[in-house]
Amino acid sequence: MAAPKLESFRRGSMFDGSFRRGSMFDGSFRQSMRDRLILQSRGYSNVNDDDKTSVRCCSYSYFSDKITGVVKKLKDVLVTAWEMGTADPRKMIFSAKMGLALTLTSILIFFKIPGLELSGHYLWAILTVVVIFEFSIGATFSKGCNRGLGTLSAGGLALGMSWISEMTGNWADVFNAASIFVVAFFATYAKLYPTMKPYEYGFRVFLLTYCYVIVSGYKTGEFMETAVSRFLLIALGASVGLIVNTCIYPIWAGEDLHNLVAKNFVNVATSLEGCVNGYLECVAYDTIPSRILVYEAVAEDPVYSGYRSAVQSTSQEDTLMSFASWEPPHGPYKSFRYPWALYVKVGGALRHCAIMVMALHGCILSEIQAAEDRRREFRNELQRVGIEGAKVLRYIGESLKKMEKLNPIEDILYEIHQAAEELQSKIDKKSYLLVNAKNWEIGNRPRVRDLTDEQKISNLDSDLSRILAHKSQSEATLRPPKNWDDVTTAANLSSATMLPYLQSRTMIHKQPSWPSRISITPGSMLQPPLGEPGKMYESASNLSLATFASLLIEFVARLENLVNAYDELSVKANFKEAVSE
């Protein structure tokens, strides 16, 4: 259907051009009507579309559609706002607290303080409430202290500079301009120092206050009144904001950090179980979501979103830790100088394990996959490691949530270490399944001929152990001599006498060669030998299984560091003793 439409469009364009030529050069009304009828017969009746569009723009249906669209969008916004508020009621409470703080500040400004006129600078109190009123108590204290210190230091420096500028006489303008440049240069350079990053807002307030006092005081000649009134109004706004935010349903950054780290334990455990179960069940993506390839959030994939939340929480943990350090003792965090930094350390150790889970998920997303029968050989061992690993993560996460120490009697890593050792032992025993065993052969071996397919299959299991023993023994005897000259001389002297013995020894220890891999299908018993590309793909697919098992063992090894980090946190934070069940 596409080709006729394209052809008709081209013919229509041709007649459209003839219509224009006829209108411009021929001037014949009959010719123009004839071209118009031809266009309409071919389905092109859009000669007066502009007129119809202009009429439709002024029609009732047009305005009705526009109003309906606006109402629909407004409804969607209201539904989204309601869902956000019900998902986290703290956001609605915080908004109400902000409105209350601004209202109280405005009311207090309306009362005139005897002997001091503040009406000309009342805006600074309102700006202070808007700026320092943050979601958490720690962030509010941080910005409030930064703003107060910046204002106080800048006001004192501005008063000193104004006193010096008065003594310069006619050079006061030049001195004030030069002082602004020098102060701005050093303050901006100082805030770029890495350790000064938490005080960046204080430096900004410092510059703003200094310039404001210098410029406004120069115009009015009242440097002292400008500095004092600004400081008092900022202190008023900061006090109202801190009191309202702290006394009415306080939101603590330390508690958010505690819950975030505990939640990440559960998310990583869910991802670990999903990766192991998905790999053993041969789960494959028909098409890998593009957002996974660029590491964006995908809520529909719990395996991906679980470990991603732990890996991506680095900046959030650092921010919450810096705010929590400003908060006074509260709730279960009653000690001064609470070890919030150790929460970040535990989160980093958990993130170190989550990276292994990400690599396990990458094995599922890989183009080359191991055969199902190969995975079935290691199913029990892989599944046990996944279950025990998820159990350890959930146990630590639950202990962190309850603020309990780990049980000193029970070793929580014992079971998973046993599972990892069983997996390693199974890999050692079945290592011929993970590589191309045919390349292991040393020397030529007689091939078993004149055997039927049924005989090869029946003898396969009995040959496995003998072949593996031969390979391991031959590898164990490969030790390079220290002096090759002695070996060559001895070989030349005894070659004639030892030849019968060597021949008999060779015949005794020769084993049947490792049979080529078989694939049993309903239609045939033995598949023909694979070509070179097929063998390469087969080896790569087997190595993918070895990669998955190795990553799982590495995950187990990294759990030790996680347990040590949690033990350190539980001791310094004075967690309660574990309840023995």
From Swiss-Prot:
Keywords: Ion channel, Ion transport, Membrane, Transmembrane, Transmembrane helix, Transport. The keyword Ion transport applies. It is found in: Membrane. Pfam families: ALMT (PF11744). It is a multi-pass membrane protein. The keyword Cytoplasm does not apply. The chain crosses the membrane at residues 98-118, 122-142, 148-164, 167-187, 201-218, 231-251. GO terms for cellular component: membrane; root hair. GO terms for biological process: cellular response to phosphate starvation; malate transmembrane transport; monoatomic ion transmembrane transport. Coiled coil: none annotated. Malate transporter. PANTHER family: ALUMINUM-ACTIVATED MALATE TRANSPORTER 10. Belongs to the aromatic acid exporter (TC 2.A.85) family. This is Putative aluminum-activated malate transporter 3. It comes from Arabidopsis thaliana. The gene is ALMT3.
